[in-house]
Amino acid sequence: MSQRKNHRGQQKKAAASPSKSAASSQLQTLSEMFPAWEADELAALLSEHHDDVEIVIDLIVNNKVSKWEPIKKEPKPKKREEVITDSNATQTSHAHNDAKPKHSRERPKNEKRRERKPVQRKEPSAAVQAAQAASPAPAAAASTSSTSSASVPSNSWAAALSKDAKPKQKKEEPEVKEPAQEQEQPKEEQEPAVAAATAAAASAASAPQETQAAPAAPAAPVAPTTTTTNDHAEKPATTWASAIKPKAKPIKKKAPEHVPEEEVSEVVVVETEVSDVVLPQQVAEVGVSFGSLALETEDVPESQPEAQPKPEAQPESQPEPEVQPEAEPEIQQEPVQQEQVQPQQVQQQVQSQPEQPQQPVPVQTQEQPQQPQQPQQPQQPQQPQAQQPQQPQQPQQPQQPQQQPQQQGQQPPHFEKPAQGYDYYPQFQQTQQYQQAAGSVPGQYAYPSFDYSAAYGQLGQAGLGSVASPGYYPAAVNGAAKPAAPAPASAEIGQSPLVQPNNMGQQSMQSGQAQVPGAAPFGYPNYYNYFYNTPFYGNGGMAASTTSYGAQQQPQSQQAAGENAPASGEPETNGVPAQAQANNQYYAQYYGQPNQFGSRGGYPYSGYPASQPYPQSAGQEQPEGAQPSAPQGAPVPGVPSYPQQMPQYGAYQQFPQYGSYQDSNQYRGWY
C-alpha cells in the first residue's frame, strides 16, 4: 500500500515529468538486466511503480509481471519493428524485397495483435527517415533485425492494401516458390533472430529506420541495433509509443550482448533469397484476395515437388521392411538359443524336483512359470520335459490347497460360525437381559423419566417372539448380517450359534459388530435413524422398538453394562467412546442436543462429524471387534467416559431437551 500511497502522492508526479532523466537511467539498468524485455514494457513498469527499480526487478525476477500483459505488450519493440518496417517496407521494401527474407513477413500470422500499429507507424516514417539520416548505423542494424521481423504488421488491411495496390505481386509470384522454402528455414532462423533483434532493439521506431536502411545495408553490423532503440524514442516523436516513452535512453550496453546472436542469425536471414511471399498471405488473412491467389497457385507446385520426393522416400522405407524380416529371424534365433538354454534348466529342474519333492511348494511354483513359458516356445521335444516337472509339482501343489483348507477349517469357526447364523434371538434377548440385569438403561442414558429397557428392549424377553425375532427387528437382522461379514474372527470365536456364549462374550461380540455405532443399532443403515428417529417424528419412521432407543440403545446399554463390568470381552476403551458417541449422537439427534460442532443436532444429518461418527465408529469398531481386547485408544475427544451418557459439550448440554431449540449455537447457520 505504501507504493500506492506514494504513487498517488508526490512520487508519481516526480516520476512523470521531472524524473525522466532518472527514469531513463533506471530504464537502462532494467533493460540491461532484462534484455528480453522491451524498453516500452520496462518504462511502463517503472511508471507504474513510480520508478522504483528494485520493485520492478523484483516483479520481473519473481515472474509477478509477465511481458505479455496486454496493454504493456502492444508497444513491444519486436512487433513495432515489424509493424513499422511493414508500413515502410511495403512502400520502400518492394524495391528491397530481394534484400529481405519474405518469410519474415509471414510472421504477422503470429502477430495479428499488431494490426492496428502499421497505420500508427506510417507516421513515424518521416521521423524515421530523419532518424536514418541522423543514425545510419542503427538503421543498418535495424535493417538486419527488421528483415527478420520487419514486415509482420502487414496484417493490417491498410498495409495489405498498400502493398497489394502496388503491382509487385508479379514479383512476388515468381518469388513465392523460393520463399516458401526460405520461409520454413528462415522462420526457424528468424525466431532466434527476432528474439535477439527485439531484445536488442527495444523501441519500435528502430523498425522504420531499419526498413529504409535495409536496402542500403541489409547485412550491416548488428551492433548498432541497440542504439536504434535509443534513437527511436528520441527521434520519431510522432509515434504515440515514442511520446509515452521516457526519452533519454542511452541503452547501448545491449549491443555487445546481442551482437553475436544477431550477426549469426540475422545476417544469414537477411541475405537469404528475398520474396514477397508474406504479402499475399497477409492479404489473405486480412481478407484481401490480391496476392493470395497467386500464392496458392504457386505454392501448389511447390508442395507438389515436395509431395513427389515422398514416393521416393517410400521406396527407401520399403527396403526397411526387408531389413526388418532379417531382424526378425535373428530375433527368432535368439529365442531358440534361449530355449536351448532353458531346456537344460528344465532338465535340471526335473532332476532336482523329484529329488526334492518336499521342497516348499512356492519354490517349485517359481520354477513352474519358466517351464510353461518354454512349452510355448517352438522347440516341442523339450516341452514334455517342461511338462513332466510340472506334473510332479502338481501333486505337491495340492498340498498347498490342502493346507489352505486346513487353515480354512481353522478359520471357519471364526467366520463360518457367525455365518452359520447367529442365534439372533438369544443374542438379542441376552443383550437386553443383560441390560435389565444392569438395570442401567434409564440411568445410563440420563433420562430417568423414560425407561427404554422397559419400553422397547424388554418386549422380546416379555415373550413377544416377534419382537425378539430378527424379522421384527430389522436392526437385528441387519446387525446379524453385519457381524457375519465384517466380524473379525477373534470376536466371534466364542460365539457359536450352538453354544450360547455368556453375556460377556456376546457383549464383546455385539459391541464389536452389531453395535458398531455407525451400524445404527444392529446395523440399521444410518439413514433410518437420521431421518425417521428425529425428535420430530418421535421415533416415528421405524417401529418404536426398532428406534435407536429400542434396538440400538439396548445393545449399547448392554455394552455399557458390560463395559462398566470389566468382565466384558472388550475393555471399556473399545466400546465406551464408540457407544458414548453413538448414544450421545443419538440423543443429540433425538433430543436435539447440539453436536460438538454446534451444528443443529435435532435435524437429520445435522452435525457434520458428530452425527456421522456412526459410520466412522462403525469402521473403527468393526476392526476392533476383530481385536476386541485392543483398546480403542483415547476416548473420542468430544465424548465423555461412558457413565456420562449426557456429554457436557457446553453448559447448555445439561438441559438436553432444550438443546436444539434454545441453543443459539444451533441456529448459527440460519442467520
Swiss-Prot record:
Subcellular localization: Cytoplasm; Nucleus; Chromosome, Telomere
Domain CUE intervals: 22-65
Chief location: cytoplasm
Biased composition regions of type Basic residues, renumbered to the chain: 1-11
InterPro entries tied to this protein: CUE
Domain of life: Eukaryota
Feature: compositional bias, Low complexity: 12-26, 125-160, 192-229, 302-322, 332-413, 422-436, 480-491, 502-513, 551-561, 602-617
Basic and acidic residues biased stretches: 66-83, 95-124, 163-190
Posttranslational mods: Ubiquitinated.
Positions of the UniProt region annotated as Disordered: 1-27, 66-266, 294-439, 480-516, 546-577, 601-651
Signal sequence region: none
Residue ranges with Polar residues bias: 85-94
GO cellular component: chromosome, telomeric region; cytoplasm; nucleus
Keyword Nucleus in record: yes
Keywords for the protein's UniProt record, in alphabetical order: Chromosome, Cytoplasm, DNA damage, DNA repair, DNA-binding, Nucleus, Telomere, Ubl conjugation, Ubl conjugation pathway
GO molecular function ontology, one term from the record: ubiquitin binding
One GO-annotated biological process of the protein: DNA repair
Subunit structure: Homodimer; may form higher order oligomers. Interacts with the large RNA polymerase II subunit RPO21; the interaction is direct and serves to bridge RPO21 to the Elongin complex in a manner dependent on transcription stress. Interacts with RAD26.
Similarity field: Belongs to the DEF1 family.
Physiological role: Recruits the ubiquitination machinery to RNA polymerase II for polyubiquitination, removal and degradation, when the transcription-coupled repair (TCR) factor RAD26 fails to efficiently displace stalled RNA polymerase II. Also involved in telomere length regulation. Binds DNA.
UniProt-recorded name of the protein: RNA polymerase II degradation factor 1
Organism: Clavispora lusitaniae (strain ATCC 42720) (Yeast)
Name of encoding gene: DEF1
